Amino acid sequence: MNKYAIGLDFGTNSCRSLIVNLSNGDEISSHVFNYPSGQAGVVINSSDPNQARQNPADYLLGIEITIKEAIKKARVLVPDFSPHDIVGIGVDTTGSSPLPVDEKGTPLCFIKKFENNPSAMVWLWKDHTSYNEAQRITEAASKTRPDYLSRIGGTYSSEWYWSKIWHCSKENPEVFNAAYSFVEICDWIPAVLVGETNPDLIKRSICAAGHKAMFSNKWGGFPDTVFLESLSPGLGKLRGHLANKAYSAEERAGYLSAGWAEKLGLSTNVSVAVGAFDAHMGAVGAGIKKGTLVKIVGTSTCDIMISPNNKTLSDIPGVCGIVDGSVMNGYYGIEAGQSAVGDIFLWFVNHLVPDIYGKTREEKFSNLEKAAAKLKPGESGLLALDWNNGNRTILVDVRLTGLILGQTLYTQPHEIYRALVEATAFGALTIIDRIEEYGVDINEVVNCGGLAIKNSMLMQIYADVTNRPMKISRSEQTPALGAAIFGAVSAGKEISGYENLEKAQKSMTGISKTYLPINENHLIYRKLYSLYHLVHDSFGTVKQSGNLYNVMKELLDIRDNVRKDNVC
């Protein structure tokens, strides 16, 4: 008899349920639900482009619809399938995406007084309203608690837990004062499923706490009350409602509550794993192991690595955290990333590409890629910075913006499109160089996510720029697959057949395709990358005082040489 697990994947605009066969990793059915609230699921503010909130009611509706529909499909596709053979559920979400709740764990936006109040909703990962608070946290911790910053790259981000909560206290003191606690949605959703939403009893994820909330066992868990209160009066009160322990997603949050079991048609014996972020579970779904860099390439990109925790690992400036157990037990999880990748391409197509490339967005993307793929590296004479949504790694600065150099009166849209793709590849190489600079060897790169699977030009450019093979994960839904794997492991060996993640990964993950670097392309990209590096440091760092006089001229020289070779 086959056994199954469900992976629940909560993304920026939608959620999905994936049902996986535990014996071989076959993804037998899935269903996607687009969040109905706001604009594509995000509650925005036309007067403040930094705001990005989410309605948690969308998650609850999404759980019910996607699981029921996935089960319905599974019954059709697999004749002997029964929902009673589902033994585990894993949950991944975006993050840091904290939610203000009352003492029962009820979201404040569910209370009539705060209904439709964005401050009482989920503060989505890409909400950048708290950039000032993030800077002040960095300054304060640097002076009085430097250890708090040492394992998160040296800089606190506006995308993270404490900066958002602090900003909430200024933006809407009434909401802040009504909040008993702020709970990451990767913690709240499993708590809802098991029927234990008391903030004092929720099992908080080490993934979220360690990477985004300055949690470490070295100083007793979350930041101390004195430090928090020194930032802003009132912040310290929240510390009393945060436990001193955080949990790996390999552990069980509890069993599916009777209410949810009845609603979904499942057993109350279904194990629900502790939650984690989508990238970290996606890395497991992509088969991460020591020496493997997993890139989850989508609207943004998150890079994940692991390193054995029985060996000393140096702090790495500019990364989003080095956290013991955030990906797998026995390993430090290393997180880095780029704030926008697919979102840059989407912005360009939505706003700047003329209709000669197509009438619909899909036609424009298709024709742009066909035209851009015919170009040689350097042929356009363009160089871009991939900072349209700020820089996450290695500069950790949301106040940086995009840039395109080298345009002339003859520059074509597909040339700009390729330059934007190349910019994201240069950003990826910058992260690789930083990680290896601090002693972590990268033996292979595995890519997953929609862009990695669908855009062969992008993956070939990444291979050429980095001079490394780019492997593509077998699964097109790696975060959901990773969540299902965690759900299975949380059920225990006697139930699921797996006692740890490594054994589950071997049976349930794999590689579908590999892009090999082309040496002649790499040689040109080395020249372009040196210019990118100069521009990157000149605009992104205080210390760099390099002269940019030759950048445009060198771009033209590279362009002319490539075009001359094409004619020959």
Regions found by a protein language model. Give the residues of each.
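Glycine/Thr-rich phosphate-binding loops that ligate phosphate moieties of nucleotide
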Residues: 1-40, 45, 57, 84-135, ...
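Conserved active-site "lid/cap" helical segment
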Residues: 45-85, 164, 168-179
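Gly/Ser/Thr-rich active-site cleft segment
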Residues: 10-12, 101, 138-139, 143-274, ...
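Buried hydrophobic packing segments
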Residues: 66, 161-168, 193, 202-204, ...
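Conserved phosphate-binding catalytic cores of ATP/NTP-utilizing and phosphoryl-transfer enzymes
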Residues: 1, 76-79, 257-266, 276-292
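Phosphate/pyrophosphate-binding loops at sites that engage ATP/ADP/AMP, CoA/4′-phosphopantetheine
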Residues: 66-86, 172-175, 227-239, 264, ...
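Conserved active-site beta-strand element of glycosyltransferases/polysaccharide synthases
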Residues: 295, 304
